[in-house]
């Protein structure tokens, strides 16, 4: 049964048109180039090359290799650093990651899918599908067809294939095509999906240390050729957990990203000792960023509508509301619409949508598991009620995600190295949405991709932009933070 007192307790754990809109967003920054078109026609080409954001698609390459002892088939390692915001890279605590980014392939940021929450985005990364398509629409949600509730921290949900079979993860396609996979604690890896499981699979365990995760990857790579996996995926929740508990700007956050970076350095050294560091493809990415919370950015729901009308609330910290009946849904929606039109201060900093009116760029309406009424707070704002938070206490957690996936504070990480990415060294890559990762992995492993929402088909886009990635990210973060004051 839904209880407001439990809100947040379990949360610590582009289509072509979208791409065009996104590129246009950055093209607007090139005011000098646009003006020059009108008055300096002879210089148009030069200005476009210097200033404009322009996607040029280049393919990824694959192939086997020999490290001097063993023949390795095309191999890719994907390591997810949950909650690692793109700009964390420039805080001075991650020299190993920064070195990898500077010497290999670095995308300024990876665009998460909406909502920018852990489970939906991890399943998007391995299926190439938007959450509305693969069905894991939040960390917690209700399925009106089965009458069951999904909660990410409940083992029975992670082991029930009926939650996961709307999407086919990359390891299923790999196993079907005789490519061995090894999956460490990735959402969805504990179930049989479309008749397949990973060759090697580790269930989630909060107590597993970063070094144990690193050792597990190297252990798999040390297997004999007949047993060795070509696709390895590993999940690390540590940055996200600390970001929630202490906030994205805390000393504790800087400590944990430093610890993560040290272990990444040890992993790279392990690859070098095996003489495979130049050949094995390794991708470090994240699912979303993190925004700071504040007692000054709370949106109180108590006076907006009768909270007892809510039978299920989904997608914390967002408000996906579902009543016991259609009449309850209508009441909740109309109450929020009417309140939003008032002149009260609490009527600001959020938007209300019916499911059918959710912005199309979020791709978040075409699934029965998506709640009928949505209250979306502005970035950094939190929905609360007297039932789950006392005004006399400091609001927790101190860091939250889930907001608009184009917000600078929701931006994710993408760094890659290895033989398949050699054509991209020294190139300035353009940001892309995480629906593209599936195609990249399929291309590296020479797998026939299943239908997905990616549009680059295993390629990567280049950008033309004079600003450094560091300047770009930090300026956008500064502007985003200025709106929170």
UniProtKB/Swiss-Prot annotation:
Its EC number is 3.-.-.-. CDD domains: Enpp (cd16018). It is found in: Membrane. Signal peptide: none annotated. Glycans are attached at residues 67, 306, 338, 453, 467. Pfam families: Phosphodiest (PF01663). GO terms for molecular function: dinucleotide phosphatase activity; nucleoside triphosphate diphosphatase activity; ribonucleoside triphosphate phosphatase activity. The chain crosses the membrane at residues 31-51. One of its GO terms (cellular component) is membrane. Its main location: membrane. Residues 1-30 are cytoplasmic. Residues 74-404 are annotated as: Phosphodiesterase. PANTHER family: BIS(5'-ADENOSYL)-TRIPHOSPHATASE, ECTONUCLEOTIDE PYROPHOSPHATASE/PHOSPHODIESTERASE. Belongs to the nucleotide pyrophosphatase/phosphodiesterase family. This is Uncharacterized pyrophosphatase/phosphodiesterase C725.05c.
């Amino acid at each position: 049964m839904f209880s407001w007192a439990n809100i947040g307790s379990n949360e610590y754990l582009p289509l072509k048109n979208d791409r065009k809109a996104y590129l246009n967003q950055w093209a607007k920054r090139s005011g000098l180039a646009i003006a020059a078109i009108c008055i300096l026609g002879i210089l148009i080409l030069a200005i476009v090359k210097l200033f404009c954001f322009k996607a040029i698609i280049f393919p990824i390459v694959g192939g086997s290799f020999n490290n001097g002892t063993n023949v390795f088939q095309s191999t890719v390692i994907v390591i997810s650093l949950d909650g690692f915001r793109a700009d964390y890279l420039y805080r001075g605590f991650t020299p190993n990651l920064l070195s990898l980014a500077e010497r290999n392939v670095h995308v300024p940021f990876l665009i998460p899918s909406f909502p920018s929450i852990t489970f939906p985005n991890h399943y998007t990364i391995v299926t190439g599908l938007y959450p509305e398509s693969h069905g894991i629409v939040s960390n917690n949600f209700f399925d009106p067809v089965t009458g069951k509730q999904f909660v990410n921290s409940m083992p029975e949900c992670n082991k029930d294939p009926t939650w996961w079979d709307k999407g086919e993860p990359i390891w299923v396609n790999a196993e079907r095509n005789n490519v061995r996979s090894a999956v460490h604690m990735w959402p969805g890896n504990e179930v049989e999906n479309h008749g397949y499981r990973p060759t090697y699979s580790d269930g989630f365990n909060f107590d597993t240390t970063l070094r144990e995760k690193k050792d597990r990857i190297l252990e798999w790579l040390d297997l004999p050729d007949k047993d060795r996996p070509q696709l390895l995926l590993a999940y690390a929740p540590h940055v996200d957990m600390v970001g929630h508990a202490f906030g994205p700007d805390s000393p504790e956050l800087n400590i944990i990203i430093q610890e993560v970076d040290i272990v990444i350095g040890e992993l790279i050294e392990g690859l070098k000792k095996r003489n495979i560091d130049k050949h094995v493809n390794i991708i470090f990415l994240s699912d979303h960023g993190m925004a700071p919370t504040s007692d000054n950015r709370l949106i109180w729901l108590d006076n907006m509508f009768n909270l007892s009308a809510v039978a299920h609330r989904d997608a914390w910290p967002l408000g996906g509301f579902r009543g016991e009946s259609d009449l309850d849904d209508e009441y909740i929606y109309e109450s929020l619409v009417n309140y939003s039109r008032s002149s009260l201060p609490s009527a600001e900093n959020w938007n209300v949508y019916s499911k059918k009116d959710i912005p199309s760029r979020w791709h978040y309406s075409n699934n029965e598991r998506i709640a009928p009424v949505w209250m979306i707070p502005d970035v950094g704002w939190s929905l609360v009620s007297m039932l789950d938070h006392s005004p006399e206490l400091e609001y927790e957690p101190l860091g939250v995600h889930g907001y608009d996936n184009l917000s600078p504070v929701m931006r994710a990480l993408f760094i890659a190295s290895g033989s398949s990415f050699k054509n991209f060294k020294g190139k300035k890559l353009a940001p892309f949405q995480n629906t593209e990762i599936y195609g990249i992995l399929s291309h590296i492993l020479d797998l026939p991709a299943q239908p997905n929402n990616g549009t680059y088909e295993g390629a990567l886009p280049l950008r033309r932009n004079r600003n450094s990635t560091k300047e770009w990210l930090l300026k956008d973060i500064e502007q985003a933070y200025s709106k929170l004051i």
